[in-house]
């Protein structure tokens, strides 16, 4: 959890927002996936948000569903994902690493065992996408026992009660939804969300990172200007992987590098 605190403190001093890319572990294969993640970090990513392949990702649109399918086609398992996480942590000791999960994967070997494994490989946070705040107690308690930040989604229609719960239970960062629905770069994020950001700050919530539909530098800049601590982009990045992974892996890495570089540059406002 301290890695998030350190990151946000450093970014505040530099007057920057965080840019956080999302990719699915093992997409389109383990070796390529590790190269992709190295490229994202080298291009300026401040933290990572990583998915573990899942057969029914309810919160995700077709782009990230396809990423899951590519990882499954490559035979990637949760065990291999944890091996990848250990390698990423060893190579990049200071970057915050977050997982975006679904509850079935957490339940597989028991909730406590899952978070213990996360701690062992150097994960900093876990967002369980299909567990609402009011049902989160066993997850967040296990997370805190193992020094993992429990992350909560703040929807655009959050009422005061929910905002207070998110502020009370969340650690690391708060995932602020640009809009309701599923992920997807084609579903543009409705920017900005001043009122929610102000309320989250008033209730001393973990810093807000805006996600869903973030696909251009202009949106990153707008999120930071609205008071968010940064932005998360997934589908736009996964689109680059989908477009190039079969035909031109080198072109894919070059495009990813320039995309992340531009998105990070936009966080400096």
Curated annotation (Swiss-Prot):
The active site is at 49 (proton acceptor), 60 (proton acceptor). GO terms for cellular component: cytosol. Pathway: Amino-acid biosynthesis; L-tryptophan biosynthesis; L-tryptophan from chorismate: step 5/5. InterPro entries: Aldolase_TIM, RibuloseP-bd_barrel, Trp_synthase_alpha_AS, Trp_synthase_suA. Its EC number is 4.2.1.20. It is an enzyme of class 4 (lyase). GO terms for molecular function: tryptophan synthase activity. Keywords: Amino-acid biosynthesis, Aromatic amino acid biosynthesis, Lyase, Tryptophan biosynthesis. It catalyses: (1S,2R)-1-C-(indol-3-yl)glycerol 3-phosphate + L-serine = D-glyceraldehyde 3-phosphate + L-tryptophan + H2O. Disulfide bonds: none annotated. Belongs to the TrpA family. PANTHER family: TRYPTOPHAN SYNTHASE ALPHA CHAIN, CHLOROPLASTIC, TRYPTOPHAN SYNTHASE, ALPHA CHAIN. The alpha subunit is responsible for the aldol cleavage of indoleglycerol phosphate to indole and glyceraldehyde 3-phosphate. Tetramer of two alpha and two beta chains. This is Tryptophan synthase alpha chain. It comes from Salmonella arizonae (strain ATCC BAA-731 / CDC346-86 / RSK2980).
């Amino acid at each position: 959890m301290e890695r998030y605190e350190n990151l946000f403190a450093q970014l505040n001093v530099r007057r920057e927002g965080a840019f956080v890319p999302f990719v699915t572990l093992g997409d389109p294969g383990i070796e390529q996936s590790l190269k992709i993640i190295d490229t994202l970090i080298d291009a300026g990513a401040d933290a990572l948000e990583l998915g573990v392949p899942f057969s029914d990702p309810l919160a995700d649109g077709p782009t990230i569903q396809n990423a899951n399918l590519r990882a499954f086609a490559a035979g990637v398992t949760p065990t291999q994902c944890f091996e990848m996480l250990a390698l990423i942590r060893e190579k990049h000791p200071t970057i915050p690493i977050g997982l975006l999960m679904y509850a079935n994967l957490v339940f597989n070997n028991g909730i406590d065992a899952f978070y213990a494994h996360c701690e062992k490989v150097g994960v900093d946070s876990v967002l369980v996408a299909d567990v609402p705040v009011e049902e989160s107690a066993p997850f967040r308690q296990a997370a805190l026992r193992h020094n993992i930040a429990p992350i909560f989604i703040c929807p655009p229609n959050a009422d005061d009660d929910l905002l207070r719960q998110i502020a009370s239970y969340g650690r690391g960062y708060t995932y602020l939804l640009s809009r309701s629905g599923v992920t997807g770069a084609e579903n543009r994020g409705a920017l900005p969300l001043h009122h929610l950001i102000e309320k989250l700050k008033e209730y001393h919530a973990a810093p807000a990172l805006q996600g869903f539909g973030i696909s251009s530098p202009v949106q990153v800049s707008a999120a930071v200007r609205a008071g968010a601590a940064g932005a998360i982009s997934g589908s736009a990045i996964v689109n680059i992987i989908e477009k190039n992974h079969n035909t031109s892996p080198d072109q894919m890495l070059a495009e990813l590098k320039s995309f992340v570089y531009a998105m990070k540059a936009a966080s400096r406002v």
